[in-house]
Amino acid sequence: MNQTDPFISRQIDLNLDIGQGPAHMLTEQEILQYATSVNIATGAHTGEPAITDKAIAAAKEHGGLAIGALISYPDLLGYGERKIQLSNEELRATVIAQLGALAALSKAHDLEISQVRPHGYLYQQMLSNYSVAETVAKAIQEFSNWLILVGPVSPVLQEVGSWTNIRVAFEARIDLRYKADGSVMPFDIERDANLDIETATARARDLVYKSAVKLEDEKDIELNFETIHLPSRIKNSVEIAKLVRGMVLKPLPLKTVDYEPYLSEFI
């Protein structure tokens, strides 16, 4: 690859979900060294205050990591994946409560949260449900105008970000497949949970060097993004995180990445 390729010097954040319970703790710890931002579970779909506190401490130990909230519908039984229905008022309240809980624990470590990432079914709804996306964005804005909303490439999310005047950072997914419109397909446990290194490497190269994703028909489409999600709950997750980190010359936390409007114009 020619060293003058503009995408090699792009500013890219690498984000990781942590604090998702004892079963994932060791894997999360191994991947932390490759991340620049972490999204910490706030207790709605998994975790409890003590686990959240340990996750914050672990992130602080690594130094330089941006701290974010991993928000979800209140769904401990379904790990945030069930199709929960809340009124706009209920959704607003749970988002603000989750942000407040993480902000309070982070403050005890002399840290501030800088971004918010939806999880599970809430993440999927941010793709096409304008009402849900708007409610989440407004709740974030109420809490702090400075927080960055991290989510899937979506015209709905882009419009909501502009309307509510909060910064939206689109993320790319190595662990998921894409549709022709640039949106991610829902997670398929049989296929996506067993992502092999060869496929992951090809997807990472397309993202980092070409800012593109390959569809199932082998066609490439452009995908403008600011952050790449490092999955922690699939096979080969540590190896995948390592190879992605090796391709990005100088990853930077979202809060330090220069915001440029063209990154919000996709397809």
Model-derived regions, located:
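Hydrophobic faces of well-ordered beta-strands that scaffold small-molecule active sites
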Residues: 12-18, 38-40, 67-71, 114-118, ...
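Active-site rim beta-loop-alpha module in soluble metabolic enzymes
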Residues: 154-213, 219-221
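Glycine/small-residue-rich loop that forms an oxyanion/phosphate-binding "nest" at active or ligand-binding sites
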Residues: 76-115
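Glycine-rich tight-turn/loop motif centered on a GG-T
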Residues: 37-45, 77-92, 126, 183-195
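Acidic (Asp/Glu)-rich catalytic clusters
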Residues: 29-33, 54-68, 106-110
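Catalytic beta/alpha-barrel core
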Residues: 40-45, 125, 143-153
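C-terminal domain-boundary segment and adjacent tail
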Residues: 147, 241-267
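Flexible, glycine/charged-enriched surface loops at secondary-structure junctions
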Residues: 108-114, 212-224, 254-262
